[in-house]
Amino acid sequence: ELKAQASRFLKAFLDVDIAPQGCIPTVGSMQGSFTTFLLCSQLDPAKRKILFIDPGFPVQRSQVRILGIPSESFDIYDYRDEKLGPKIESFLAAGDVAAIVYSNPNNPAWICLTEDELRTIGELATRYDAIVIEDLAYLCMDFRKPLGRPFEAPYQTSVARYTKNYILLVSGSKIFSYAGQRIAVAAISDTLFRREYPALRRRYNIGRLGDAYVLVFLYAASSGTSHSAQHALAAMFRAAADGELDFVGEASEYARRARLTKKTFLRHGFRIVYDKDRGEQVSDGFFYTVGYGAMTSAELLSELLLYGVCAISLTSTGSRQHGIRVCVSQMNRPEQFEMLEERLRVFAENHK
């Protein structure tokens, strides 16, 4: 049931056709990325590297280090639009990149890759036979656009329109704020699911990618995902595709919190680090990035902690810019906004 509803959900909100067979439940997107990194690194002995388009989710960088998988990365800050293709190709041309990883919308910057940029990524992935791991944890959460209407344009942008070499990670904890149960779906394209890899057959006696992913990698990692969480996610997928659950409307509360807190940071001398999408102001959402004066990421993080403001350093996300990632998910009481205002006011007074 979950596989069927996941397939329908992806059609409803991405306008992408993926057979139920390829929609595979995982114990959260964390397990999805962990196992797909390992899978991709074993498809071709000549291709083991993971290419991260940064900034990104820090734990994914930790995952490849834990697994002993080599990686490369670059900060997208200076490589938007027509600059993106040549930069990615400079890595792929070496012939050792197994997979390209990014999130869209982006964690932590909340920038959103455009159709043209995704077309570029997809075409290069096809040309160099690399797999794109597209993390859609924040699917349809570019709140500048009227996304989230099932089976109606505009749809969430996705590399799935431009290559057959893709795996989509869809997170129940983010899309539906269903965090406690750890449930997600790794959606593998039909072509990639059926593809035979000699290296997999030699190593596991299972050559088809989709079969190997389920019967080797996921089985060894956890033996499966809890049935109760699968039933819950299936019900939410069904309700969303039926138009009964407005998950985008529910999540727009995070955009409201981001707008309010951004104004507070800006009022006290901070700046938005990743502030533009092709000349347009970046969307509001779960996360955004701020910097202050000439402070490095570590300096700003350490100083803000002294004033009772917690965040993570942009350095941990692979960013080459200086600043911190702000998360608004726990800003759920009116008095917290007043506390932030007062703490940043004192911070600014002490850092003139």
Which role does the model predict for each range below?
Residues 1, 8, 12, 130, ...:
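N-terminal "arm"/small-domain region of PLP-dependent enzymes with the aminotransferase-like
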Residues 1-128, 133, 139-162, 167:
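Conserved core of the PLP fold type I
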Residues 4, 8, 12, 16-18, ...:
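PLP-dependent enzyme catalytic core of the Aspartate aminotransferase-like
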Residues 30-31, 56-58, 78, 105-108, ...:
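Short, solvent-exposed loop/turn segments at secondary-structure junctions
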Residues 56, 227-230, 234, 247-266, ...:
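Conserved glycine-rich beta-strand-loop-beta hairpin in the small C-terminal domain of fold type I
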Residues 131, 167, 287, 323-325:
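Structural preference for beta-strand elements that scaffold enzyme active sites
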Residues 161-252:
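Conserved core segment of the aminotransferase class I/II
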Residues 187, 289-291, 327-329:
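Short hydrophobic/aromatic beta-strand micro-patches
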